[in-house]
């Protein structure tokens, strides 16, 4: 399979049109382990246990699917600490991807994230990425720097509102991490991690993790492509006025502007507009 004029071609030069699906939503969260036990979580069994794989994959084949957008996360690969890769999880991935290939289904690997991490209201990056920048991952909800489903009831009345999770893109936790990941050298050049600029350090860790994953999975013949990052966000980058609300996907409930988010994250009370 190859590409000509932005079109996928098979060995005979015919256009290839895939029928695909995501696999799967459960892969964003560990099988076991909560927000506090992040070093020892396990993603083995996501998207499903090996013993159930045959039934699920045969069903997808019968339904006519020829491509799977296979979800992995940075946290699943490197949750224990920088450079500490979960080889057991990678071995599990190799087995699952081999079974997918045996069904004649192709795979596009999708390094997934929503609002940076589970500690900032979504999924994706490991907790240590925040801790390396001095954030207390157990206190982000308390100061409004994140709204997580796991800790919402501790600080708010009622249940976790539907579709409020995208508002985390504008809260301090996720907005700061994305700003530093993509623009730290420009906007915060004196912010360092282990003596290196925050942007360079974070990007090097992320890319090193993806390279390691690629090396472990490169013999899986079902893989035809590899994504970079699902739905990256600019954080505060591009905002014209940090007093207001910009770069937002959804405005629901109390929504702080950039400066308000920074003040609240420092432990001070602020009044935020409610949408």
Predicted regions and their residues:
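Active-site region of glycoside hydrolase catalytic domains
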Residues: 3-4, 95-98, 102-108, 113-275
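Solvent-exposed loop/turn segments at secondary-structure junctions
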Residues: 24-28, 74-77, 113-116, 231-234
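A cross-family glycoside hydrolase active-site/sugar-binding cleft signature
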Residues: 20-24, 69-73, 108-112, 227-229
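Aromatic-lined carbohydrate-binding/catalytic grooves of carbohydrate-active enzymes
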Residues: 65-90
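A general structural detector for well-ordered alpha-helical segments in enzyme core domains, enriched
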Residues: 55-60, 89-96, 209, 213
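Short acidic, glycine/proline-rich loop/turn micro-motifs
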Residues: 33-34, 78-82, 240
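N-terminal carbohydrate-binding accessory modules
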Residues: 1-67, 98, 102, 106, ...
């Amino acid at each position: 399979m190859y590409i000509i004029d932005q079109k996928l071609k098979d060995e005979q030069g015919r256009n290839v049109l895939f029928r695909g699906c995501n696999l799967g939503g459960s892969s964003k969260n560990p099988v076991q382990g909560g927000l506090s036990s992040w070093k020892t979580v396990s993603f083995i069994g996501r998207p499903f246990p090996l013993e159930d794989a045959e039934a699920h994959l045969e069903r997808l084949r019968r339904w006519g699917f020829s491509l799977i957008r296979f979800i992995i996360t940075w946290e699943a690969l490197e949750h224990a600490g920088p450079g500490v890769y979960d080889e057991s999880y990678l071995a599990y991935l190799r087995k699952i991807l081999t079974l997918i290939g045996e069904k004649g289904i192709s795979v596009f690997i999708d390094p997934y994230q929503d609002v940076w991490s589970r500690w900032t209201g979504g999924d994706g990056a490991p907790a240590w990425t925040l801790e390396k920048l001095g954030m207390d991952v157990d206190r982000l909800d308390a100061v409004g720097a994140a709204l997580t489903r796991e800790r919402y009831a501790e600080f708010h009345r009622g249940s976790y509102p539907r579709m409020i999770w995208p508002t985390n893109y504008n809260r301090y936790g996720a907005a700061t991490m994305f700003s530093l990941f993509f623009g730290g050298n420009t906007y915060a050049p004196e912010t360092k991690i282990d003596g290196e600029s925050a942007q360079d350090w974070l990007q090097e860790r992320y890319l090193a993790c993806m390279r390691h994953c690629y090396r472990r999975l490169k013999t899986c013949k079902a893989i035809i492509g590899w994504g970079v990052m699902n739905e990256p966000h600019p954080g505060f980058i591009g905002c014209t006025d940090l007093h207001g609300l910009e770069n937002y996907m959804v405005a629901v409930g109390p929504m702080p502007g950039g400066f308000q988010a920074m003040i609240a994250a420092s432990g001070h009370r602020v009044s935020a507009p409610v949408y």
